[in-house]
């Protein structure tokens, strides 16, 4: 929230008993260099909106408070009601109070006018996370039959400045629904993700657009490219699962084999990458980790040169799945699982040593014959 803005005052003083002297004339402004002229032009452009005629930025020196505008004289502002005994009351700036007092007034009146529409822009500039303002703006967009493409340009600029704001992404989604035109979306989202590839607001919007408008083509190639750039990006692994689950699925043996081998290759590049291990477990666990042909042998082959806590924990899961499915050499498999739990507790994942010892005790109590369980367990 903006802080309260103080207003400084100054007075010219002279010597005691002497008449006040007029201030000296101001020096002439220095000639603007080309760069300064360009900056001044940009500042002038920023003060006016390409969407709302007559809109002035709140930072403009010519901005006038709503209470001082003749065209708003018919409105009684509605102050915020914090109750009789507010605790830790927010100190709003004068502009903030003024804008939102008038916004509450037009909201109560359900005033669907051009001036109310312009007011929402000021309110959004002060707090773009206020969902009530966005909702009322959408009501006005429909009632005033505004150009939705202009509104798309407006929301694009705001998202570029505030890419992690729930309300701005929801507003964009509604506009895309109204326009029934996703043609700008994937490129726009890719641009946002190029700045922060883990922005879950952008990923959520991308998934909605792809699913709503059936834009599955080339998405897996896009995911491949992002994983080449950052194989640790859990958001991209999640997108890979989303795309395949909604297209080919994993029931096709060829697809599953491709994904298993793809993931193992990514693991070889970065063995300590938990995201890849989670993906591998996610695509196999419904069918049973121990039932995938040759997976155990491939993991054991990785262990000497690519060992990590995640590999060992995955092996524990595989052995547990084998025990659950009544394997022939149950005692041997149990001992291997218990040995790995101890390695994790003592060497590879000591911060969670008590967890791994708990897993070991649970495996013993579930899969040991009662007479075989050590007295200390």
Curated annotation (Swiss-Prot):
Residues 19-32 have a biased composition (Pro residues). Keywords: Acetylation, Magnesium, Phosphoprotein, Prenyltransferase, Repeat, Transferase. GO terms for cellular component: CAAX-protein geranylgeranyltransferase complex; microtubule associated complex; protein farnesyltransferase complex. Changing residue 164 to A: Inhibits prenylation activity. In myoblasts, impaired insulin-induced RAC1 activation, possibly due to impaired insulin-induced geranyl-geranyltransferase activation. No effect on MUSK-binding. Phosphorylated. Phosphorylation is mediated by MUSK upon AGRIN stimulation and results in the activation of FNTA. GO terms for biological process: enzyme-linked receptor protein signaling pathway; positive regulation of Rac protein signal transduction; positive regulation of skeletal muscle acetylcholine-gated channel clustering; protein farnesylation; protein geranylgeranylation; regulation of microtubule-based movement. Residues 1-55 are annotated as: Disordered. PFTA repeats lie at residues 112-146, 147-181, 182-214, 215-249, 255-289. The keyword Phosphoprotein applies. Its EC number is 2.5.1.58, 2.5.1.59. Coiled coil: none annotated. InterPro entries: Prenyl_trans_a. Essential subunit of both the farnesyltransferase and the geranylgeranyltransferase complex. Contributes to the transfer of a farnesyl or geranylgeranyl moiety from farnesyl or geranylgeranyl diphosphate to a cysteine at the fourth position from the C-terminus of several proteins having the C-terminal sequence Cys-aliphatic-aliphatic-X. May positively regulate neuromuscular junction development downstream of MUSK via its function in RAC1 prenylation and activation. Belongs to the protein prenyltransferase subunit alpha family. This is Protein farnesyltransferase/geranylgeranyltransferase type-1 subunit alpha. It comes from Mus musculus (Mouse). The lineage of its organism: Eukaryota, Metazoa, Chordata, Craniata, Vertebrata. The gene is Fnta.
């Amino acid at each position: 929230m903006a802080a309260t803005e103080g207003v400084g005052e100054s007075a010219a003083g002279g010597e005691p008993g002497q008449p006040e002297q007029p201030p000296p004339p101001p020096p002439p402004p220095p000639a603007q260099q080309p760069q300064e002229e360009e900056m001044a032009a940009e500042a002038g452009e920023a003060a006016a909106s390409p969407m709302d005629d007559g809109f002035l930025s709140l930072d403009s020196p010519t901005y006038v408070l709503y209470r001082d505008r003749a065209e708003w004289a018919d409105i009684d502002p509605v102050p915020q009601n914090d109750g009789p005994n507010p605790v830790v009351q927010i100190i709003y700036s004068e502009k903030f109070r003024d804008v939102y007092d008038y916004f509450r007034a037009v909201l109560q009146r359900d005033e669907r006018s051009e001036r109310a529409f312009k007011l929402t822009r000021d309110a959004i500039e002060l707090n773009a996370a206020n969902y009530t303002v966005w909702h009322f703006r959408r009501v006005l967009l429909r009632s005033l039959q505004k150009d939705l493409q202009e509104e798309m340009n407006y929301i694009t600029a705001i998202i570029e400045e505030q890419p992690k704001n729930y309300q701005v992404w929801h507003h964009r989604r509604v506009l895309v629904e109204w326009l029934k035109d996703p043609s700008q979306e994937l490129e726009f989202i890719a641009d946002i993700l190029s700045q922060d590839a883990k922005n879950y607001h952008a990923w959520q919007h991308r998934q909605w657009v792809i699913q709503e408008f059936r834009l599955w083509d080339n998405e897996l190639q896009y995911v491949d490219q992002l994983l080449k750039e950052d194989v640790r990006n859990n958001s991209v692994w999640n997108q890979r699962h989303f795309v395949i689950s909604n297209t080919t699925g994993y029931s096709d043996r060829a697809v599953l084999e491709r994904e298993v081998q793809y993931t193992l290759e990514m693991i070889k590049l970065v063995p300590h990458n938990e995201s890849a291990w989670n993906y591998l477990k996610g695509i196999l666990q419904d069918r049973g980790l121990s039932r995938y042909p040759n997976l155990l042998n491939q993991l054991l082959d990785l262990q000497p040169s690519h060992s990590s806590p995640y590999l060992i924990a995955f092996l524990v899961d595989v052995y547990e799945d084998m025990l659950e499915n009544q394997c022939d050499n149950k005692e041997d498999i149990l001992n291997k699982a218990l040995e790995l739990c101890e390695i994790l507790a003592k060497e590879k994942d000591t911060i969670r040593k008590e967890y791994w010892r708990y897993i070991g005790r649970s495996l013993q109590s579930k899969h040991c014959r009662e007479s075989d369980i050590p007295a200390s367990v």
